Amino acid sequence: MQHTRRMLNPLLTGLRNLPARGATTTTAAAPAKVEKTVNTVTILGRVGADPQLRGSQEHPVVTFSVATHTNYKYENGDWAQRTDWHRVVVFKPNLRDTVLEYLKKGQRTMVQGKITYGEITDQQGNQKTSTSIIADDVLFFRDANN
């Protein structure tokens, strides 16, 4: 658990890895019970803006957003589309550099990783809950006309 906390600290200025949504943190020499858990997410969508390099020189991180859509059909036959925006962070050095150099706004991409929660303090001092996907892999797709 300490490794995860150290890894998330440099994410953004003001980002704190705090327990959220029922999460708890425990510290002990050995846990009372060891069991396997799974925190895996895969999204396929379009990049909202060119990736940005953030963090510090010692702890760089690349962030970008991905839009996914859900289509709905109403009883009257009309269609609606809901867009969800996902915040993606990349810590892995080689993946981070590749994403920063090659991934562009509007490009179709698939991200595999895990979900993490925390809080961000904005410039006015207000705290907001932050949900991010820590990328383990990012796949790039080219449009047929490119």
Curated annotation (Swiss-Prot):
Main location: mitochondrion
Presequence boundaries: 1-22
Phenotype seen when the gene is deleted: RNAi-mediated knockdown in the testes results in a reduced number of paternal mitochondrial nucleoids at the nebenkern stage of spermatogenesis. However, the clearance of nucleoids at the elongation stage of spermatogenesis is unaffected.
Residues annotated as domain SSB: 38-142
Result of changing residue 85 to T: Reduced DNA synthesis by the polymerase PolG1. Severe decrease in the stimulation of DNA synthesis by the polymerase PolG1 and decreased DNA binding
Highest taxon of the lineage: Eukaryota
Keyword Transit peptide carried by entry: yes
GO molecular function: enzyme activator activity; single-stranded DNA binding
Cellular compartment(s): Mitochondrion
Tissue expression as described in the entry: Uniformly distributed in the early embryo. High levels detected in the anterior and posterior midgut primordia of stage 12 embryos. In larvae, high levels were detected in proliferating tissues including the CNS and digestive tract. In adults, highly expressed in the CNS, digestive tract and ovary.
Gene Ontology biological process: DNA replication; DNA synthesis involved in DNA replication; DNA-templated DNA replication; mitochondrial DNA replication; mitochondrial genome maintenance; positive regulation of DNA-directed DNA polymerase activity; positive regulation of mitochondrial DNA replication
Keywords: DNA replication, DNA-binding, Mitochondrion, Transit peptide
GO CC, any one term: mitochondrial nucleoid
Subunit note: Homotetramer.
Protein purpose: Binds preferentially and cooperatively to pyrimidine rich single-stranded DNA (ss-DNA). Required to maintain the copy number of mitochondrial DNA (mtDNA) and plays crucial roles during mtDNA replication that stimulate activity of the gamma complex polymerase PolG1/tam at the replication fork. Promotes PolG1 activity largely by organizing the template DNA and eliminating secondary structures to favor ss-DNA conformations that facilitate PolG1 activity.
Name of the protein: Single-stranded DNA-binding protein, mitochondrial
Species this protein is from: Drosophila melanogaster (Fruit fly)
